[in-house]
Swiss-Prot record:
Gene: TIMM10
GO annotation, biological process: protein insertion into mitochondrial inner membrane
Tagged with keyword Protein transport: yes
GO cellular component, one term: mitochondrial intermembrane space protein transporter complex
UniProt protein name: Mitochondrial import inner membrane translocase subunit Tim10
UniProt main location, coarse: mitochondrion
Membrane-topology annotation of the record: Peripheral membrane protein
Disulphide bridges: 29-54, 33-50
Entry's family note: Belongs to the small Tim family.
GO molecular function ontology, one term from the record: protein homodimerization activity
Family matches, as Pfam families: zf-Tim10_DDP
SUPFAM superfamilies assigned: Tim10-like (SSF144122)
Gene3D superfamilies: Mitochondrial import inner membrane translocase subunit tim13 like domains
Length: 90
């Protein structure tokens, strides 16, 4: 696969993953913070605060997980390089 096509696929996958994360966050926070039977057309103060906190926590955890996965991936790459260097030419 040529590098340009690989880059396009990676970008498409990233957009798809972000859309999925947004949809899951929206659904989870809506279920948690907004009752199924609306009493008013507008969000109440409590609902609004709940949604704000829920989204904030969701994004914070998403960022932390991304950093940890990047860290683990870099460690794996380093271990692979060391293993290749120690095995030497075959």
């Amino acid at each position: 696969m040529d590098p340009l096509r690989a880059q396009q696929l990676a970008a498409e996958l990233e957009v798809e993953m972000m859309a999925d994360m947004y949809n899951r966050m929206t659904s989870a926070c809506h279920r948690k913070c907004v009752p199924p039977h609306y009493k008013e057309a507008e969000l109440s103060k409590g609902e609004s605060v709940c949604l704000d906190r829920c989204v904030s926590k969701y994004l914070d955890i998403h960022e932390r997980m991304g950093k940890k996965l990047t860290e683990l991936s870099m460690q794996d790459e380093e271990l692979m390089k060391r293993a290749q260097q120690s095995s030497g030419p075959v």
